[in-house]
């Protein structure tokens, strides 16, 4: 076999591999969108529950000290437990979808019964740990936003009752989002609009940011669960190494640190998603 034939064969094999990876990426992206739509209502349920508890606390603020305002606003431990109750089952289902997508493709070729164990120790352990981390992170971001808005209100000379009233539409947002709402309120107040009109516009803007935050959390956590499920699926069928695949238009970080890079399974855990809008996936390394 001469060099030209070998080169043609090599190019042909590379083309087949590239097509296979592109197909895998497209299928993974479709699976991610499907499961993201399923997770959004659950994230929304948790966020609405947290907002309801916080807004209830805002009706009882007279005796609250500014420095402990956020901590005393609600029973945060109860919110954490409710968040875990709502989110853990759905994240476990999404993890299973990622695992099944790998295992079923492999086992079908062997003409055996495809099965991914979603109730196995690794899957359940990940879901428990990750859900607790997620809920805690969301709560800490929410607390920090409240602290910053309380401090800003006091620095501006507002009463604690006035601060509580302005907090109502923004509890549950991140610091940046809450700051954007506060800035929007200030701009409206400069226009000397009626208070009722200002409150209506602020609430509409805040609700848009609440929806955005819910969608962003759902997108990120769907990617996390599917990625973990994919890795656990690879482990079940004996794959030892994986390769990262990024879209051609992915961000610089993903192109430099994930796309084409080879990882052991241990190294790959937690790599994807690299950021909230990350759409990278793992394929079995050749």
Residue ranges and their predicted role:
Residues 196, 201-286:
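Acidic, glycine-rich two-metal-ion catalytic cores of nucleic acid-processing enzymes
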Residues 1-204, 286:
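N-terminal leader/targeting and assembly helices and adjacent pre-domain segments
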């Amino acid at each position: 076999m001469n060099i030209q034939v070998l080169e043609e064969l090599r190019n042909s094999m590379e083309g087949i591999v590239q097509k296979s990876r592109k197909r895998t990426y497209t299928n993974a992206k479709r699976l991610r969108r499907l499961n993201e739509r399923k997770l959004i209502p659950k994230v929304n349920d948790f966020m609405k529950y947290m907002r309801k508890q916080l807004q209830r606390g805002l009706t009882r603020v007279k005796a609250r000290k500014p420095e402990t305002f956020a901590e005393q606003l609600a029973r945060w431990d109860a919110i954490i437990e409710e968040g875990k109750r709502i989110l853990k089952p759905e994240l476990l289902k999404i993890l299973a979808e990622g695992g099944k997508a790998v295992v079923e493709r492999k086992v079908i070729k062997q003409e055996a019964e495809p099965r991914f164990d979603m109730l196995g120790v690794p899957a359940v352990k990940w879901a428990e740990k990750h859900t607790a981390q997620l809920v805690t992170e969301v709560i800490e971001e929410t607390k920090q936003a409240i602290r910053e808005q309380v401090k800003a209100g006091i620095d501006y000379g507002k009463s604690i009752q006035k601060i509580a009233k302005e907090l109502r539409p923004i509890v549950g947002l991140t610091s940046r989002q809450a700051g954007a709402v506060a800035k929007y309120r200030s701009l409206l107040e400069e226009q000397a609009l009626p208070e009722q009109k200002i409150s209506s516009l602020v609430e509409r803007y805040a609700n848009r940011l609440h929806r955005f935050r819910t969608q962003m959390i759902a997108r990120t956590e769907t990617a996390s669960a599917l990625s973990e499920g994919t890795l656990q699926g690879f482990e079940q069928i004996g794959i030892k190494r994986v390769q990262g695949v990024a879209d051609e238009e992915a961000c610089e970080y993903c192109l430099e640190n994930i796309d084409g890079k080879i990882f052991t399974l241990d190294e790959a855990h937690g790599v994807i998603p690299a950021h909230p809008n990350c759409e990278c996936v793992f394929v079995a390394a050749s």
